[in-house]
Protein backbone atom coordinates (compact mmCIF):
# COMPACT_ATOMS: atom_id res chain seq x y z
CA UNK A 1 0.00 0.00 0.00
CA UNK A 2 2.88 2.36 0.80
CA UNK A 3 4.36 1.83 -2.66
CA UNK A 4 1.01 2.13 -4.43
CA UNK A 5 0.29 5.41 -2.65
CA UNK A 6 3.66 6.83 -3.64
CA UNK A 7 3.13 5.66 -7.23
CA UNK A 8 0.27 8.16 -7.35
CA UNK A 9 2.73 10.93 -6.53
CA UNK A 10 5.83 10.13 -8.55
CA UNK A 11 6.88 7.57 -11.13
CA UNK A 12 9.72 5.13 -10.26
CA UNK A 13 13.29 6.11 -11.07
CA UNK A 14 14.75 3.67 -13.55
CA UNK A 15 18.32 4.91 -13.27
CA UNK A 16 20.83 3.52 -13.80
CA UNK A 17 22.02 5.12 -10.57
CA UNK A 18 23.61 4.27 -7.24
CA UNK A 19 23.09 7.15 -4.81
CA UNK A 20 25.06 7.63 -1.57
CA UNK A 21 23.71 10.04 1.07
CA UNK A 22 24.38 11.23 4.62
CA UNK A 23 23.01 13.67 7.20
CA UNK A 24 25.91 13.36 9.65
CA UNK A 25 23.99 10.95 11.89
CA UNK A 26 23.78 8.14 9.36
CA UNK A 27 25.12 7.25 5.95
CA UNK A 28 23.50 5.10 3.33
CA UNK A 29 23.05 4.17 -0.29
CA UNK A 30 20.21 3.15 -2.57
CA UNK A 31 20.12 1.47 -5.95
CA UNK A 32 17.67 2.09 -8.79
CA UNK A 33 14.83 -0.39 -9.17
CA UNK A 34 16.55 -2.21 -12.06
CA UNK A 35 19.82 -2.71 -10.21
CA UNK A 36 21.85 -1.55 -13.20
CA UNK A 37 24.74 -0.16 -11.12
CA UNK A 38 27.04 -2.34 -8.96
CA UNK A 39 27.40 -1.47 -5.26
CA UNK A 40 29.28 -3.92 -3.03
CA UNK A 41 30.12 -3.60 0.65
CA UNK A 42 32.30 -5.11 3.38
CA UNK A 43 31.68 -4.94 7.14
CA UNK A 44 34.87 -5.56 9.12
CA UNK A 45 35.57 -6.77 12.66
CA UNK A 46 37.15 -3.41 13.52
CA UNK A 47 33.77 -1.68 12.86
CA UNK A 48 34.39 -0.29 9.40
CA UNK A 49 31.96 -0.38 6.50
CA UNK A 50 33.39 -0.07 3.00
CA UNK A 51 31.18 0.33 -0.06
CA UNK A 52 32.31 0.80 -3.64
CA UNK A 53 31.29 -0.12 -7.15
CA UNK A 54 33.85 -2.92 -7.22
CA UNK A 55 35.47 -5.33 -4.76
CA UNK A 56 39.09 -4.58 -3.93
CA UNK A 57 38.96 -0.80 -4.04
CA UNK A 58 40.68 -0.75 -0.62
CA UNK A 59 43.01 -3.59 0.47
CA UNK A 60 41.34 -5.59 3.27
CA UNK A 61 42.55 -8.65 5.14
CA UNK A 62 39.98 -11.39 4.40
CA UNK A 63 40.23 -12.54 8.02
CA UNK A 64 38.97 -9.11 9.11
CA UNK A 65 35.74 -9.35 7.10
CA UNK A 66 32.68 -9.91 9.29
CA UNK A 67 30.13 -9.85 6.46
CA UNK A 68 29.90 -8.81 2.83
CA UNK A 69 27.24 -8.41 0.20
CA UNK A 70 25.85 -6.30 -2.56
CA UNK A 71 23.11 -3.71 -2.74
CA UNK A 72 20.02 -5.20 -4.38
CA UNK A 73 17.66 -3.45 -6.85
CA UNK A 74 15.56 -0.79 -5.14
CA UNK A 75 16.98 -1.66 -1.71
CA UNK A 76 18.40 0.68 0.93
CA UNK A 77 21.69 0.24 2.78
CA UNK A 78 21.92 2.36 5.94
CA UNK A 79 24.55 2.67 8.68
CA UNK A 80 23.24 4.40 11.81
CA UNK A 81 26.14 6.00 13.71
CA UNK A 82 24.11 6.65 16.87
CA UNK A 83 22.92 3.03 17.13
CA UNK A 84 26.18 1.65 15.81
CA UNK A 85 24.57 -0.82 13.42
CA UNK A 86 23.48 -1.50 9.87
CA UNK A 87 19.72 -0.98 9.64
CA UNK A 88 17.98 -3.57 7.40
CA UNK A 89 15.98 -2.40 4.38
CA UNK A 90 12.74 -4.00 5.62
CA UNK A 91 12.99 -2.27 9.00
CA UNK A 92 13.40 1.17 7.41
CA UNK A 93 10.50 0.79 5.01
CA UNK A 94 8.19 -0.89 7.52
CA UNK A 95 8.63 2.08 9.86
CA UNK A 96 7.56 4.53 7.17
CA UNK A 97 4.76 2.31 5.83
CA UNK A 98 3.16 2.07 9.29
CA UNK A 99 3.02 5.84 9.86
CA UNK A 100 -0.21 6.41 7.89
CA UNK A 101 -3.21 4.36 6.64
CA UNK A 102 -2.05 4.18 3.02
CA UNK A 103 -4.26 1.21 2.16
CA UNK A 104 -7.38 3.00 3.35
CA UNK A 105 -6.44 6.12 1.39
CA UNK A 106 -5.97 4.10 -1.80
CA UNK A 107 -9.32 2.34 -1.31
CA UNK A 108 -11.18 5.60 -0.72
CA UNK A 109 -9.63 7.78 -3.41
CA UNK A 110 -8.01 5.91 -6.29
CA UNK A 111 -9.99 5.28 -9.46
CA UNK A 112 -9.23 2.50 -11.95
CA UNK A 113 -10.06 2.77 -15.63
CA UNK A 114 -12.27 -0.33 -15.31
CA UNK A 115 -14.42 1.51 -12.75
CA UNK A 116 -15.64 3.98 -15.38
CA UNK A 117 -18.66 2.72 -17.30
CA UNK A 118 -18.98 3.88 -20.90
CA UNK A 119 -22.33 5.14 -22.13
CA UNK A 120 -23.26 4.60 -25.77
CA UNK A 121 -21.13 3.29 -28.62
CA UNK A 122 -17.48 4.21 -29.11
CA UNK A 123 -16.57 5.96 -32.35
CA UNK A 124 -15.28 3.57 -35.00
CA UNK A 125 -13.58 3.84 -38.37
CA UNK A 126 -15.41 5.40 -41.29
CA UNK A 127 -14.38 3.30 -44.28
CA UNK A 128 -15.40 6.05 -46.71
CA UNK A 129 -12.89 8.52 -45.24
CA UNK A 130 -10.27 6.07 -43.97
CA UNK A 131 -7.77 6.65 -46.80
CA UNK A 132 -8.05 10.43 -46.52
CA UNK A 133 -7.49 10.27 -42.76
CA UNK A 134 -4.44 8.05 -43.17
CA UNK A 135 -2.98 10.48 -45.67
CA UNK A 136 -3.73 13.41 -43.37
CA UNK A 137 -1.79 11.75 -40.57
CA UNK A 138 1.20 10.81 -42.70
CA UNK A 139 0.71 7.06 -43.08
CA UNK A 140 2.94 5.52 -45.74
CA UNK A 141 3.39 2.11 -47.33
CA UNK A 142 6.36 1.52 -45.00
CA UNK A 143 4.22 2.37 -41.98
CA UNK A 144 1.70 -0.28 -42.95
CA UNK A 145 4.22 -2.92 -44.02
CA UNK A 146 6.71 -2.74 -41.16
CA UNK A 147 4.68 -1.39 -38.22
CA UNK A 148 0.95 -2.06 -38.43
CA UNK A 149 0.65 -5.31 -40.39
CA UNK A 150 2.91 -7.31 -38.01
CA UNK A 151 0.63 -6.19 -35.17
CA UNK A 152 -2.48 -7.38 -37.01
CA UNK A 153 -1.26 -10.57 -38.69
CA UNK A 154 1.38 -11.87 -36.27
CA UNK A 155 0.12 -10.26 -33.03
CA UNK A 156 3.61 -9.08 -32.10
CA UNK A 157 5.51 -5.85 -31.90
CA UNK A 158 7.45 -5.04 -35.07
CA UNK A 159 11.17 -5.79 -34.79
CA UNK A 160 13.95 -3.47 -35.87
CA UNK A 161 17.31 -2.11 -34.84
CA UNK A 162 17.78 1.19 -33.06
CA UNK A 163 19.25 4.17 -34.81
CA UNK A 164 17.64 5.86 -37.80
CA UNK A 165 19.57 6.37 -41.01
CA UNK A 166 16.65 7.38 -43.24
CA UNK A 167 16.77 10.58 -45.27
CA UNK A 168 16.28 13.71 -43.17
CA UNK A 169 12.69 14.93 -43.07
CA UNK A 170 13.83 18.48 -43.82
CA UNK A 171 15.19 17.28 -47.20
CA UNK A 172 12.08 15.31 -48.18
CA UNK A 173 9.87 16.53 -51.03
CA UNK A 174 6.81 15.01 -49.32
CA UNK A 175 4.90 16.32 -46.29
CA UNK A 176 6.22 14.68 -43.10
CA UNK A 177 4.99 14.46 -39.53
CA UNK A 178 6.67 16.81 -37.08
CA UNK A 179 7.99 13.78 -35.16
CA UNK A 180 10.10 12.78 -38.17
CA UNK A 181 12.25 15.87 -37.66
CA UNK A 182 13.51 14.52 -34.31
CA UNK A 183 15.32 11.21 -34.65
CA UNK A 184 18.00 9.37 -32.69
CA UNK A 185 20.83 8.31 -34.97
CA UNK A 186 22.77 6.22 -32.44
CA UNK A 187 21.71 3.00 -30.73
CA UNK A 188 20.99 3.31 -27.00
CA UNK A 189 23.02 0.92 -24.83
CA UNK A 190 22.09 -0.42 -21.41
CA UNK A 191 24.36 -2.31 -19.05
CA UNK A 192 23.37 -5.06 -18.66
CA UNK A 193 21.06 -5.55 -21.60
CA UNK A 194 17.32 -5.18 -20.94
CA UNK A 195 15.62 -8.38 -22.08
CA UNK A 196 11.99 -9.44 -22.16
CA UNK A 197 12.30 -11.41 -18.90
CA UNK A 198 13.70 -8.44 -16.99
CA UNK A 199 11.04 -6.20 -18.54
CA UNK A 200 8.22 -8.45 -17.34
CA UNK A 201 9.60 -8.71 -13.79
CA UNK A 202 10.54 -5.08 -13.19
CA UNK A 203 9.03 -2.72 -15.73
CA UNK A 204 5.42 -1.61 -16.08
CA UNK A 205 3.38 0.56 -18.44
CA UNK A 206 1.00 1.51 -15.64
CA UNK A 207 0.60 5.25 -15.18
CA UNK A 208 -1.48 7.72 -13.19
CA UNK A 209 -3.21 10.80 -14.59
CA UNK A 210 -5.32 13.60 -13.23
CA UNK A 211 -4.85 16.57 -10.89
CA UNK A 212 -1.91 16.45 -8.48
CA UNK A 213 -1.41 17.83 -4.98
CA UNK A 214 1.53 19.36 -3.13
CA UNK A 215 4.44 16.91 -3.27
CA UNK A 216 5.69 18.04 0.15
CA UNK A 217 2.45 17.26 2.01
CA UNK A 218 1.55 13.64 2.80
CA UNK A 219 -2.24 13.61 2.61
CA UNK A 220 -5.05 11.34 1.43
CA UNK A 221 -5.68 13.68 -1.52
CA UNK A 222 -2.54 12.36 -3.27
CA UNK A 223 -4.31 9.04 -3.84
CA UNK A 224 -7.07 10.75 -5.83
CA UNK A 225 -5.66 9.76 -9.22
CA UNK A 226 -6.88 7.73 -12.19
CA UNK A 227 -4.82 4.57 -12.70
CA UNK A 228 -4.26 3.52 -16.30
CA UNK A 229 -2.91 0.05 -17.15
CA UNK A 230 -1.04 1.51 -20.14
CA UNK A 231 -0.63 4.90 -21.84
CA UNK A 232 -2.19 3.81 -25.17
CA UNK A 233 -5.98 3.59 -24.99
CA UNK A 234 -8.47 1.63 -27.07
CA UNK A 235 -11.42 3.52 -28.57
CA UNK A 236 -13.74 2.02 -25.94
CA UNK A 237 -11.49 3.17 -23.10
CA UNK A 238 -11.20 6.67 -24.52
CA UNK A 239 -14.96 6.79 -25.01
CA UNK A 240 -15.40 5.98 -21.32
CA UNK A 241 -13.08 8.85 -20.40
CA UNK A 242 -14.98 11.27 -22.64
CA UNK A 243 -18.27 10.60 -20.91
CA UNK A 244 -16.80 10.28 -17.42
CA UNK A 245 -18.81 11.69 -14.54
CA UNK A 246 -17.63 9.55 -11.67
CA UNK A 247 -16.88 10.51 -8.06
CA UNK A 248 -16.39 14.14 -9.01
CA UNK A 249 -14.24 13.40 -12.08
CA UNK A 250 -15.27 14.96 -15.40
CA UNK A 251 -13.48 15.39 -18.72
CA UNK A 252 -13.58 18.17 -21.32
CA UNK A 253 -12.97 17.39 -25.01
CA UNK A 254 -11.06 20.17 -26.79
CA UNK A 255 -11.00 20.20 -30.58
CA UNK A 256 -7.49 20.83 -31.98
CA UNK A 257 -8.49 21.16 -35.63
CA UNK A 258 -9.08 24.41 -37.52
CA UNK A 259 -10.53 25.48 -40.90
CA UNK A 260 -8.19 24.64 -43.75
CA UNK A 261 -8.75 28.02 -45.39
CA UNK A 262 -7.06 29.81 -42.45
CA UNK A 263 -3.68 28.41 -43.49
CA UNK A 264 -0.55 28.84 -41.37
CA UNK A 265 -2.12 31.71 -39.43
CA UNK A 266 -4.73 29.27 -38.17
CA UNK A 267 -2.10 27.23 -36.32
CA UNK A 268 -1.13 29.98 -33.86
CA UNK A 269 -4.75 31.05 -33.50
CA UNK A 270 -5.80 27.49 -32.71
CA UNK A 271 -2.99 26.96 -30.20
CA UNK A 272 -4.09 30.10 -28.34
CA UNK A 273 -7.68 28.83 -28.33
CA UNK A 274 -6.65 25.41 -27.01
CA UNK A 275 -4.75 27.04 -24.13
CA UNK A 276 -7.70 29.25 -23.24
CA UNK A 277 -10.17 26.37 -23.32
CA UNK A 278 -7.92 24.21 -21.13
CA UNK A 279 -7.58 26.99 -18.55
CA UNK A 280 -11.36 27.45 -18.64
CA UNK A 281 -11.84 23.71 -18.09
CA UNK A 282 -9.77 24.01 -14.90
CA UNK A 283 -11.94 26.90 -13.69
CA UNK A 284 -15.06 24.81 -14.36
CA UNK A 285 -13.73 21.93 -12.26
CA UNK A 286 -12.82 19.40 -14.95
CA UNK A 287 -10.22 16.78 -14.03
CA UNK A 288 -9.12 15.84 -17.57
CA UNK A 289 -8.71 17.73 -20.84
CA UNK A 290 -8.87 15.52 -23.95
CA UNK A 291 -7.13 17.16 -26.92
CA UNK A 292 -8.80 15.60 -29.96
CA UNK A 293 -8.16 15.77 -33.71
CA UNK A 294 -11.06 13.42 -34.56
CA UNK A 295 -12.88 16.30 -36.33
CA UNK A 296 -10.30 16.28 -39.17
CA UNK A 297 -11.97 16.38 -42.61
CA UNK A 298 -11.58 17.86 -46.08
CA UNK A 299 -12.30 21.29 -44.64
CA UNK A 300 -10.55 20.98 -41.27
CA UNK A 301 -6.89 20.18 -40.59
CA UNK A 302 -5.32 19.22 -37.24
CA UNK A 303 -2.62 20.95 -35.26
CA UNK A 304 0.06 18.39 -34.44
CA UNK A 305 -0.63 16.84 -31.05
CA UNK A 306 3.06 17.31 -30.26
CA UNK A 307 2.65 21.07 -30.69
CA UNK A 308 -0.76 21.18 -29.02
CA UNK A 309 0.22 19.19 -25.92
CA UNK A 310 3.57 20.96 -25.59
CA UNK A 311 2.01 24.40 -25.92
CA UNK A 312 -0.74 23.63 -23.41
CA UNK A 313 1.74 22.09 -20.97
CA UNK A 314 4.04 25.12 -20.94
CA UNK A 315 1.10 27.54 -20.85
CA UNK A 316 -0.27 25.82 -17.75
CA UNK A 317 3.16 25.66 -16.12
CA UNK A 318 3.69 29.38 -16.77
CA UNK A 319 0.35 30.16 -15.14
CA UNK A 320 0.84 27.73 -12.21
CA UNK A 321 -2.07 25.53 -13.37
CA UNK A 322 -0.38 22.38 -14.67
CA UNK A 323 -0.98 20.16 -11.65
CA UNK A 324 -4.71 20.95 -11.61
CA UNK A 325 -5.65 18.91 -14.70
CA UNK A 326 -4.57 15.83 -16.62
CA UNK A 327 -4.00 15.82 -20.39
CA UNK A 328 -5.16 13.03 -22.72
CA UNK A 329 -4.60 12.96 -26.49
CA UNK A 330 -7.00 11.53 -29.07
CA UNK A 331 -5.07 11.46 -32.31
CA UNK A 332 -4.33 9.61 -35.52
CA UNK A 333 -0.63 10.42 -35.14
CA UNK A 334 0.21 7.92 -32.39
CA UNK A 335 1.81 4.84 -33.90
CA UNK A 336 5.57 4.71 -33.20
Question: Language model features by range: what are they?
Answer:
Residues 3-6, 14-16, 34-37, 60-65, ...:
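Short alpha-helical segments and helix-capping/turn motifs at coil-helix boundaries
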Residues 30-76, 86-113:
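Extended active-site and interfacial segments that coordinate phosphate-rich ligands
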Residues 35, 76-77, 293, 312:
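Conserved structural-core and active-site-/substrate-pathway-adjacent residues in large, well-folded domains
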